[in-house]
Each structure stands twice: as structure tokens, then as C-alpha cells.
């Protein structure tokens, strides 16, 4: 392990605290490999370098015997690399930067044209020409930067900018776009919640109107509160589960929900029939049945679209058939009217009555105004629960 040293050695022998098994690879140019001799002087400017033979001296080290590098080497030229441990505190900052005397503000950065003039010499044309070089193009387009193929310049600056951002990172998001993108769904959600709360009040309002018919001129009250189990006074529309009238209240609410669902289905059916999405064949003259099919050989050609079903044909006679085109709108309504008129002959009189009312339009309008004036408040109280459904119906009517 080597005898302890009584005196400090100079040079590499002094470095006894830094073990380095690779000390026999010195990092200066005195190696004969660099042909350093008297004719070729040393160009290593390290003032603390040792003579070459002293690099072979053995140092104790922290992990046993080993070769200690000459000056610096893999450890650098610092005092710690030389084996000199310095424990003195660092020098205080000069007075100009001392906090006691006040620090000067950071100077304003000079403009880009002064610090990086080479960056101001580029324009889009020069940049496109530089992209023709495969080595430069490979920095922005790794998939197309090979030197074996010729690449065309980027046609637009926008596409070039997007490619550079995809390489260096996404740009900062525009908060205005984020706000406008979130504002729309929030308003829709608020409108949906408002309509939902209003729609949920429809059954309760209709239930109140239904029960009020049983208490004409008398304040409504639940008959179940006079049973054997006394319950506090309450309305028949807010019976607790322990009240005998609770089951009747649930039954009324269920019937009201079915009525609302039927009303929505009727509205949807009318809307589809108006748009011509119900290609129902009308009743053929002189018959109570219909036969829908393509027109092949018809005595009367069908006018309009040729898509199937395009016409209504009677039973063929002698290979020919009578064809009637399907109406493009209100086909189902016309079918229902023809079907009802064939079974109830008195309905045909309503057509003349409607035509007569249309001919007397001022009288009809005055009659309608008088009816609204007389029965308007009662109609409003009855139809007010259905007002929240009006925007939904209007939206469906406009969208389909």
C-alpha cells in the first residue's frame, strides 16, 4: 500500500486524495506520440504541469494504490483536480453589485438586428431555396429530408409555419377562441336545464288543472286526509306516500305523461308528413285498397319523381294499370281524409263549410278575435304548461 509520507511531495505526488486508475493516460502534449521535444516545444500552457517521469509515481488515493494523473487530465485543471483542497470562502462581490449599495437594473436587450444580424437576412424566398438542400430540409421534414430525392419548396408560408411548430412545439393557444368555444355549449346547457325544469312542471300544472275540475267553487283538498290515519291538510297534487290519495296522484301523472308523449309523436308525424317523408299512397278511385309499386305500363303516367314508390297502381287489366302519383307533401293527411270521407259521408260537408269560411274571411277573423277575448284567460291558464314545448317544436320544425 506504500509507506506514509512525512513531507508533502510536489507535483503529482502531492495529489493523495483523488484516486484515478487511468492516471497513466495524461492529458498534455508531452507524450512522445505528439512529438514534443526540444525541436518541437511544448504547447501545453498549463503552468501546474509536471514532468513526464513524475506521472508514474504511485499515490495512495482514497481507494487504494493507483496511478495519479498529472495535471488535470480527466478531472480538469481545478485545484480540486490537482489534489489541493481549498476551504476558503469565495470572494465577496464587488461594490458595484453589492446589495448594500444597490443593484443596477438590468439593461434593455438590444434589438435583434444588432445581436443577430444573420437572422434578419433571411426572407421567404431564401428560406424556400435553402429547403432544397436535403440536409436543411431534414431539420424540418424528417420524413422527406433524404439526399437521394429532390424536394420541392414549400408553397406557402402558412404550411411552413405549421411544420416548424410541429417540430419545435405548439404555439400558445388563443384564449379568445377557447372562450368562444366554451360559451356556446354552456349557453346550450343552461337553456336545456331551464327547459327541463319547466317541462317537469307540466305534469304538476296539468294535475292541478285536472283536480280543480272536481272542486268547482270549492278549495281543493285531498280526500285521503279524512281517513283513519289522520294526515295534515295538503293539496291533492302533493300527497305524501302515506296518503291514500298518493296512488291516484301517480296514476294521473302517468296519464299526463302518456298524453304529452302522444302529443310529441303527433307533432313529429305531422312534421314528417309536411316534409314528404311519408310516401303513403292515396286511395284509388272506386276502391278501398291501395297498391304501391313501380310504374311499368300505365294508362295514366305518374308525374313527379321516379323513385320507388313513385305511383299507386290499380290491378292490371290486359297488362295495363292506372297509376296515381304520390303527393310530395301531406300524403298521409290526404290518405286519412280520403279514408274518413269514404266511411263518413257527412265529412264532405265540412269542405264546403271551410270554403265558405275562407270566403268570409273578415267575419271569421272577427269571430276568432271575439273567442280569444272571451275565453283567452282560461285558454292561457290551460295552455301555459305547454309553452316550454313551443321552442322545441319550432326547432324541430326548422331543422327537418
From Swiss-Prot:
<keyword id="KW-0946">Virion</keyword>
<feature type="region of interest" description="Disordered">
    <location>
        <begin position="70"/>
        <end position="115"/>
    </location>
</feature>
<keyword id="KW-1160">Virus entry into host cell</keyword>
<feature type="transmembrane region" description="Helical; Name=TM1; Note=In external conformation">
    <location>
        <begin position="182"/>
        <end position="202"/>
    </location>
</feature>
<feature type="topological domain" description="Virion surface">
    <location>
        <begin position="275"/>
        <end position="348"/>
    </location>
</feature>
<dbReference type="GO" id="GO:0075513">
    <property type="term" value="P:caveolin-mediated endocytosis of virus by host cell"/>
</dbReference>
<keyword id="KW-0007">Acetylation</keyword>
<keyword id="KW-0812">Transmembrane</keyword>
<dbReference type="GO" id="GO:0019062">
    <property type="term" value="P:virion attachment to host cell"/>
</dbReference>
<keyword id="KW-0449">Lipoprotein</keyword>
<dbReference type="InterPro" id="IPR000349">
    <property type="entry name" value="HBV_HBSAG"/>
</dbReference>
<feature type="topological domain" description="Virion surface">
    <location>
        <begin position="399"/>
        <end position="400"/>
    </location>
</feature>
<dbReference type="GO" id="GO:0019031">
    <property type="term" value="C:viral envelope"/>
</dbReference>
<keyword id="KW-1166">Caveolin-mediated endocytosis of virus by host</keyword>
<protein>
    <recommendedName>
        <fullName>Large envelope protein</fullName>
    </recommendedName>
</protein>
<dbReference type="GO" id="GO:0039654">
    <property type="term" value="P:fusion of virus membrane with host endosome membrane"/>
</dbReference>
<keyword id="KW-0261">Viral envelope protein</keyword>
<keyword id="KW-1170">Fusion of virus membrane with host endosomal membrane</keyword>
<keyword id="KW-0519">Myristate</keyword>
<dbReference type="Pfam" id="PF00695">
    <property type="entry name" value="vMSA"/>
</dbReference>
<keyword id="KW-0472">Membrane</keyword>
<comment type="similarity">
    <text>Belongs to the orthohepadnavirus major surface antigen family.</text>
</comment>
<dbReference type="GO" id="GO:0016020">
    <property type="term" value="C:membrane"/>
</dbReference>
<keyword id="KW-1162">Viral penetration into host cytoplasm</keyword>
<keyword id="KW-1161">Viral attachment to host cell</keyword>
<feature type="region of interest" description="Pre-S1">
    <location>
        <begin position="2"/>
        <end position="119"/>
    </location>
</feature>
<feature type="compositionally biased region" description="Polar residues">
    <location>
        <begin position="79"/>
        <end position="88"/>
    </location>
</feature>
<keyword id="KW-0325">Glycoprotein</keyword>
<keyword id="KW-1168">Fusion of virus membrane with host membrane</keyword>
<feature type="lipid moiety-binding region" description="N-myristoyl glycine; by host">
    <location>
        <position position="2"/>
    </location>
</feature>
<keyword id="KW-0945">Host-virus interaction</keyword>
<feature type="topological domain" description="Intravirion; in internal conformation">
    <location>
        <begin position="2"/>
        <end position="253"/>
    </location>
</feature>
<keyword id="KW-1164">Virus endocytosis by host</keyword>
<feature type="glycosylation site" description="N-linked (GlcNAc...) asparagine; by host">
    <location>
        <position position="320"/>
    </location>
</feature>
<feature type="topological domain" description="Intravirion">
    <location>
        <begin position="370"/>
        <end position="375"/>
    </location>
</feature>
<feature type="region of interest" description="Pre-S">
    <location>
        <begin position="2"/>
        <end position="174"/>
    </location>
</feature>
<feature type="transmembrane region" description="Helical">
    <location>
        <begin position="349"/>
        <end position="369"/>
    </location>
</feature>
<comment type="function">
    <text>The middle envelope protein plays an important role in the budding of the virion. It is involved in the induction of budding in a nucleocapsid independent way. In this process the majority of envelope proteins bud to form subviral lipoprotein particles of 22 nm of diameter that do not contain a nucleocapsid.</text>
</comment>
<feature type="region of interest" description="Pre-S2">
    <location>
        <begin position="120"/>
        <end position="174"/>
    </location>
</feature>
<comment type="function">
    <text>The large envelope protein exists in two topological conformations, one which is termed 'external' or Le-HBsAg and the other 'internal' or Li-HBsAg. In its external conformation the protein attaches the virus to cell receptors and thereby initiating infection. This interaction determines the species specificity and liver tropism. This attachment induces virion internalization predominantly through caveolin-mediated endocytosis. The large envelope protein also assures fusion between virion membrane and endosomal membrane.</text>
</comment>
<feature type="transmembrane region" description="Helical; Name=TM2">
    <location>
        <begin position="254"/>
        <end position="274"/>
    </location>
</feature>
<keyword id="KW-1133">Transmembrane helix</keyword>
